[in-house]
Structures are given as structure tokens and as C-alpha cells.
Amino acid sequence: VKRNYLPLKTTVKVSTQTQLPLHLVITHPQYRFVDLFAGIGGFRIALEKLGGRCSGYSEIDKQAIQVYQQNFISYLNSDEIAFGDVSKISNLPDNLDLIVGGVPCQPWSVAGCLRGFEDPRGKLWFDVIKLVQKSQPKSFIFENVSGLASPRNRENLELIIDELTSCGYQVYWQLLNAYDFGLPQNRERVFIVGIRKNIDNYERFKFPLPLGIHPKVLDILEDIKNIQPVKKVKLSADTLFNGFVPPSRTRFQKEDELNDFFIFSDLRNGHTTIHSWDIIKTTERQKSICLALLKLRRSKKYGEKDGHPVAFSTFLEIIPDLKIEELNQLVSLGICWQTTAGKYEFINSKNMTGINGIYRIILPTADIIPTLTATGAKDYIATISITATHPQEYKQLFLKKIYKPKKFREITPQDARKLQGFPDNFIYHPQSAIAKKQFGNAVPITVVQAVARNLLEIILPN
């Protein structure tokens, strides 16, 4: 019987069988590795596919350990070492070929406020470096969020690389995106690879090139079928962006096509932005007042950062005939609120919090899903597709055919499993929120496999 859930239980027990192919456990391994910050085993799946055997793993999250043991620990390897807290490991097994790990990324992410080494989790890098120095494996692969390579954190990245280099390694790093390795997810991560300098050809390592395989979101959706691919109409920048293309657009957002997602936000005004005044019944006059607030609250004239509540007198600069009663009507409608200073601001005034619990609805015909995160973005997937020839028509079709009839659903653990490249027989946590958090913390398996394959060609030439 195929299982995709964990048995409900209160204690962690070792399974008497593993859901992964048993030959991965009982055949002679080609190399040995240790799995630090193991999570639910993304690194391990990739490395076992390439003939490796795990000599031990380190993880402190009890729910992640439960999932990890359910999938990887059986009577055949029940003596495998569980190291626990990385900061408390004194010794690793001798003669390791490889150490891997997704060092906690929150200190370097936007969600973690980019605190870096100021965050205790950021200091775990030094524990990792000490283990590399002491155990001297042939090589290592570490993964982290792209924020570690941002200009703000570049000095920290260089410090990490310098410290690892001083341990006797040639160190390489590169940003790699899961989309380039056969997964329909925009997930860019830093990969840091080191090879001990007494290994032959250590200087010849190269990061893998993109595979050129690009499945669509539809390919990973098990419950949404019979949707034909959409041929998008080419439109001018004037039509889409009023002549100015926002610099924040990603490589997946084409400058001559309609977006394949809709953002719910009162803070921006893109061609697929849904505002609260699009959802709540409002007059054209009320809509124009809301757009005026959107513009004024972002003006540098009132401060360096955007998000400034706007006074009635400021509104009069661009709407001279505005009545204060009109602003108070928007307060009554639940679109705005009035501060203690008598200024006006949107109720939905935080970026990425969305409206009515929704931040983004992605069309099933999209090329990618945005990055899965441990914190869980308020993203949904539409269950039908739409197409249009003009932004306004597109927006109205979305509201009429998808939003109002609720033709959308949450991203499920099954979706997350496929977006990260985990196999179909992987047993994930029975609670959806926990499972999605764990997949959001995981590494994309196809990327690890591609990096590891190139590394193994150096450290295992035979």
C-alpha cells in the first residue's frame, strides 16, 4: 500500500522498513557522508541516489527527526549515529568523503530580517567550520539562501569562504536556481563546495550547467487536469506598465506578456494587482481616492521610506475638491483607517500580508511557483485558467471566473513535495502546515544531485 503520511504517534520510533529502495542501504557504498542540519533528508536522498551511505545525521527539530527516521532509518541501519545539536558535536567519523548541510538560513533571509552573525543561528557557521577543520573530509557541500550572497551580506560570505579555505580547502560558491534543474519553482540558493587541496584535480571542479528541462506548474498538480496551455498575447510596455517597466521584475516575468499570477495588495499597482477596492463595492470616485493614497504614501517628499499615512491637506494637492467625508466613507468600508494624528492609511498596509488571507493566486498554466518558504507565503493555485488580450480584461476575468467563485486552492504538501523534487514514496508529516514548513526548509533534490555528481567526479575518479 502506498503511504504518503506518517502514522499518528506521540513518540519517535524506528521503522522496521524504509520506504526508500533497500539496495541503498545494503549494497557496498561508493562513498560516505555526514548529513548536518539534516531536516527531512533532502541532501540524503540526492546523495544516496549517487551511491553514498550516510554515516550519521544531525538535527534538533523533533518533528523533522520523526520524518527523517521514518524515511531513512530501518533495522538495517538502526545503529546509524544521530549527532543531535551541531554545536555539541565533538567528533565526526574518520575518513569521511563528504560533509553536507543546509546551515540555518533565517539570519540571511528577508524573513529573518537579515541579521546574519548577529543571530545565534548565524553563528552555527563557526561550529560547521570547526567540524570541517577537525574531521578533514575530502569535500563538503553547504547550502544557504541567496541573501547570504547579497551586497549587504557579501563580507559575511567572504569570511565564511576564507575560514573554510584556511582549513585546507579549495572553496567554490555559486547561486543556483531550482528552475534550472527541472523543478517549476523559482528557488535561488547559494551552494558552497569545498575540496581538500591534497585531492588530485581539486582545482578542476565546475558547478553544473542548467539542464534545459522546464516542466510547468501543471505538471506537478495531481488534481488539476484537462487544462490546455495558454498562448500569451504579446503586449507593449506602454500597455502593461504605462511605459515604465519596474526594475523589481524577475527573470520569469516577461516585459511583453501578462503575468501568470495575481497579487493581492493595496501597496502596489501592477497590471495584475488586486486591491481591496476591487473586491469591495466602490465607486470610480472612491477608487481614484484610493489610488491617490497609494501614490502619496510612497512619496519621498514625506520621508525616506514609503508607507507614510497621509493628511487630508496632502490629499488636496492632487484632489482639490476632495471632501473629508469621502475619506471617512473609505474608513467605513474597511479600506482605510485614521491614525491618532488624523492621517489616513490603508488597513492592508504590510507588504506580503495580502488581503483577506490571500497574497498571491498563481494560474495553473504558470511556468513557476514562487519560492516555497518555511514561514509559508499566503499563496494559492487557481484551478482553472484564463487568457485575455488586455490588462483590464484580464483582471476582470480573474475576479469573475476565479476569485469570486473561489476557483483556487492552497498549495498542498503533495505540491511542495514535487516542487522540491522529493520522490513519490516519501512519507511526510501528517499535519499539512508542518509538512509544508519542512518542505520549505528543505533543499531541492535535483540541484543537490547535479552539484554532487560534479563533485564526486573529482573526489572519486574511479
Question: Residue locations for each model-derived region?
Answer:
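C-terminal target-recognition/interaction regions appended to catalytic cores
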Residues: 3, 20, 262-462
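Conserved beta-strand scaffold positions in the cores of enzyme catalytic domains, especially
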Residues: 33, 57, 81-82, 171-173, ...
